[in-house]
């Protein structure tokens, strides 16, 4: 192993190897390259990176792209908003043999939206190379998909575990030339019950395959995957300080009772001439309920959740991305799949039930130095959760000031 530190397997504390008790991995790779030009990337890929608007690699890109390109198995612990999608997109594109029209990389993601988001990033970065990428997701026509995959194998397939397994199983997707396997948001996939499908997909791939795993948290089921399927992985931790709560102003509003949240939201609407906002709730049913209530009061809002069919979800996301719909009400399912540049306001109508989702929700707001505002509605019962979030992220959430509109 080159590049890793000498105490590669030292264990100074209990818990699984390379982990500290807080479920945070310990890095064993110290090389940092802080400039895309110094990464020995193909000229056409560099053009794509700069055309996409990247100027300087983010913390995770500075650390993880090189070991990925060198072919190491890599575990990267990083949240959304850190530039992780581009990290593995660049690594895959650099290793592609473009003239060879076979599928050479496979990416798994927990939701359709995230899979499509990843596909967009890969196609944009690989634009000058002529890279092809197909999104393999449920909710779309299976027959069309088979025809597409058979007509010409895409260089890269990105998809949700269920549909990808289906395509491998029916032999429409050939594992023969796949040399790189990426699991994005592994914690999200395992918590959604995709474990069996992921294990079955591994069984179908070459044993020599390079595995790259990205995860915001490292629960035991994720560690189990790394132990079972990865060889001497490079471990890279993007520490919390480097994450995107920086630049996001976080506030709370005391709402004495749950039923007063609706009025609070409507009051905010009038105060804030918002560019675009996402409102998070904890259940699909509540999303429908709030959407109806807002419509009844003549506020224009769109709703998005996992019970909707794919076409409907696509239309709503398109309207929101283009700015023709300005307020999106949704659940955590989509916190991971929405990357909308203009969102400057996130409202947690419900505080997330687990604190990891907090950064998934508001890490959207201030991407890479863009400013953003997060407003949390807090009832008496929620105060403890909010304090827990503050401690976990080492951050402070202040009471919302009167002039909040000026901050957005």
Curated annotation (Swiss-Prot):
Residues reported to bind ATP: 77-84
PROSITE patterns: HELICASE_ATP_BIND_1, HELICASE_CTER, Q_MOTIF
Pfam families: DEAD, Helicase_C
Motif DEAD box in this chain: 183-186
Enzyme class: hydrolase
Protein name per the record: Eukaryotic initiation factor 4A-II
Source organism, top-level taxon: Eukaryota
GO MF annotation, one: translation initiation factor activity
Oligomer and partners: eIF4F is a multi-subunit complex, the composition of which varies with external and internal environmental conditions. It is composed of at least EIF4A, EIF4E and EIF4G1/EIFFG3. Interacts with EIF4E. May interact with NOM1.
Alphabetized UniProt keyword annotations: ATP-binding, Helicase, Hydrolase, Initiation factor, Nucleotide-binding, Phosphoprotein, Protein biosynthesis, RNA-binding
High-level lineage: Eukaryota, Metazoa, Chordata, Craniata, Vertebrata
Motif (Q motif): 34-62
Ranges where the record places region Disordered: 1-22
Job description of the protein: ATP-dependent RNA helicase which is a subunit of the eIF4F complex involved in cap recognition and is required for mRNA binding to ribosome. In the current model of translation initiation, eIF4A unwinds RNA secondary structures in the 5'-UTR of mRNAs which is necessary to allow efficient binding of the small ribosomal subunit, and subsequent scanning for the initiator codon.
PTM-bearing positions, type Phosphothreonine: 160
Catalytic activity: ATP + H2O = ADP + phosphate + H(+)
SUPFAM superfamilies according to UniProt: P-loop containing nucleoside triphosphate hydrolases
EC code: 3.6.4.13
Helicase C-terminal domain: residues covered: 247-408
Limits of the Helicase ATP-binding domain: 65-236
Entry similarity comment: Belongs to the DEAD box helicase family. eIF4A subfamily.
PANTHER family xrefs: ATP-DEPENDENT RNA HELICASE DBP3
